């Protein structure tokens, strides 16, 4: 059971957040902001940097990955007793 004070606080927060989201949606931007101008370029350059860093790490620093033993492991001869 909620106390009346907590219930009133929660209900006012819900109403306030609904009103704020309505005000945000009705607001019209007059000029593009940083994300509108450079968002895709920043995303693409960050993705390219991460891909290059991982490719370098995977190929150049000498990690032995041991992905599959097929073709590298030969079975030993079976010893009959």
Curated annotation (Swiss-Prot):
Matches recorded under SUPFAM superfamilies: Mitochondrial cytochrome c oxidase subunit VIIb (SSF81423)
Q: Which CDD domains match?
A: Cyt_c_Oxidase_VIIb
Query: What membrane topology was assigned to this protein in its record?
Result: Single-pass membrane protein
Q: Which cysteine pairs are covalently linked by disulfides here?
A: none
Q: Which GO terms describe its cellular component?
A: mitochondrial inner membrane; respiratory chain complex IV
GO BP terms: namely:
mitochondrial electron transport, cytochrome c to oxygen
Superkingdom of this protein's organism = Eukaryota
Q: Which UniProt keywords apply?
A: Membrane, Mitochondrion, Mitochondrion inner membrane, Transit peptide, Transmembrane, Transmembrane helix
Q: What Pfam families does the record tag this protein with?
A: COX7B
Transit peptide: which residues? 1-25
Q: Which InterPro entries match?
A: Cyt_c_oxidase_suVIIB (IPR008433), Cyt_c_oxidase_suVIIB_dom_sf (IPR023272)
Q: Which residues lie on this side of the membrane: Mitochondrial matrix?
A: 26-33
Q: Which residues lie on this side of the membrane: Mitochondrial intermembrane?
A: 61-81
Please tell me whether the keyword Transmembrane helix is annotated for this protein: yes
Q: Does Electron transport count among this protein's keywords?
A: no
Principal place where this protein is found?
Answer: mitochondrion
Q: Which Gene3D superfamilies match?
A: Cytochrome C Oxidase, chain K (4.10.51.10)
User: What does the record note on quaternary structure?
Assistant: Component of the cytochrome c oxidase (complex IV, CIV), a multisubunit enzyme composed of 14 subunits. The complex is composed of a catalytic core of 3 subunits MT-CO1, MT-CO2 and MT-CO3, encoded in the mitochondrial DNA, and 11 supernumerary subunits COX4I, COX5A, COX5B, COX6A, COX6B, COX6C, COX7A, COX7B, COX7C, COX8 and NDUFA4, which are encoded in the nuclear genome.
Known function: Component of the cytochrome c oxidase, the last enzyme in the mitochondrial electron transport chain which drives oxidative phosphorylation. The respiratory chain contains 3 multisubunit complexes succinate dehydrogenase (complex II, CII), ubiquinol-cytochrome c oxidoreductase (cytochrome b-c1 complex, complex III, CIII) and cytochrome c oxidase (complex IV, CIV), that cooperate to transfer electrons derived from NADH and succinate to molecular oxygen, creating an electrochemical gradient over the inner membrane that drives transmembrane transport and the ATP synthase.
Q: Which family does it belong to?
A: Belongs to the cytochrome c oxidase VIIb family.
| UniProt protein name | Cytochrome c oxidase subunit 7B2, mitochondrial
Species: Macaca fascicularis (Crab-eating macaque)
